[in-house]
From Swiss-Prot:
<dbReference type="InterPro" id="IPR020549">
    <property type="entry name" value="YbeY_CS"/>
</dbReference>
<keyword id="KW-0963">Cytoplasm</keyword>
<keyword id="KW-0479">Metal-binding</keyword>
<dbReference type="GO" id="GO:0006364">
    <property type="term" value="P:rRNA processing"/>
</dbReference>
<keyword id="KW-0690">Ribosome biogenesis</keyword>
<dbReference type="GO" id="GO:0008270">
    <property type="term" value="F:zinc ion binding"/>
</dbReference>
<feature type="binding site">
    <location>
        <position position="123"/>
    </location>
    <ligand>
        <name>Zn(2+)</name>
    </ligand>
</feature>
<feature type="binding site">
    <location>
        <position position="113"/>
    </location>
    <ligand>
        <name>Zn(2+)</name>
    </ligand>
</feature>
<dbReference type="InterPro" id="IPR002036">
    <property type="entry name" value="YbeY"/>
</dbReference>
<comment type="similarity">
    <text>Belongs to the endoribonuclease YbeY family.</text>
</comment>
<dbReference type="GO" id="GO:0004222">
    <property type="term" value="F:metalloendopeptidase activity"/>
</dbReference>
<dbReference type="Pfam" id="PF02130">
    <property type="entry name" value="YbeY"/>
</dbReference>
<keyword id="KW-0540">Nuclease</keyword>
<keyword id="KW-0378">Hydrolase</keyword>
<comment type="function">
    <text>Single strand-specific metallo-endoribonuclease involved in late-stage 70S ribosome quality control and in maturation of the 3' terminus of the 16S rRNA.</text>
</comment>
<keyword id="KW-0255">Endonuclease</keyword>
<dbReference type="InterPro" id="IPR023091">
    <property type="entry name" value="MetalPrtase_cat_dom_sf_prd"/>
</dbReference>
């Protein structure tokens, strides 16, 4: 069982970012219960790139915390490539402050959330959102973090 991480740091300042080992751990804890072998690219970007991708792929004219791009192999081809996560540093940092969450916990949550999207989970419908949030909470707590949705539940 292993998750292969391709970490891309496309930010002006890399200081204070989680380590490659932390990203790998968060991916592994999220993905391996569902898929024991996988390759995932995690790209950390600044707001301009996040904004452009969010506008191009989702029609949203603003940067966002995490974008997930699942990979679909052509029929008959078996590949471990799960997909790409694009995480915006400034949005994650701003949200952590606004939501009064430890920064490291919010980074972990974005990796967990994005990874579940790569695995096919979504939160468009209420029942899907409930299932996905429950999984996120369980995974985060298994890693020693608090429930990322605690403030919303109070």
């Amino acid at each position: 069982m292993s998750i292969e991480l391709d970490l891309q740091l496309a930010v002006e300042n890399e200081h204070g970012l989680p380590s490659e080992a932390e990203f790998a751990l968060w991916l592994s804890r999220t993905i391996t219960p569902f898929q024991p072998q996988a390759e995932v690219t995690v790209r950390i970007v600044d707001e301009a790139e996040s904004h452009a991708l969010n506008l191009n792929y989702r029609g949203k004219d603003k940067p966002t915390n995490v974008l997930s791009f699942p990979f679909e192999a052509p029929p008959g081809m078996e590949m471990d490539l799960l997909g790409d996560l694009v995480i915006c540093r400034q949005v994650v940092e701003r949200e952590a402050i606004e939501q009064n969450k430890p920064l490291q916990a919010h980074w972990a949550h974005m990796v967990v959330h994005g990874s579940l999207h790569l695995l096919g989970y979504d939160h468009i419908e209420d029942d899907e959102a409930e299932e996905m949030e429950s999984l996120e909470t369980e995974i985060m707590q298994e890693m020693g973090f608090t429930d990322p949705y605690l403030a919303e539940k109070e």
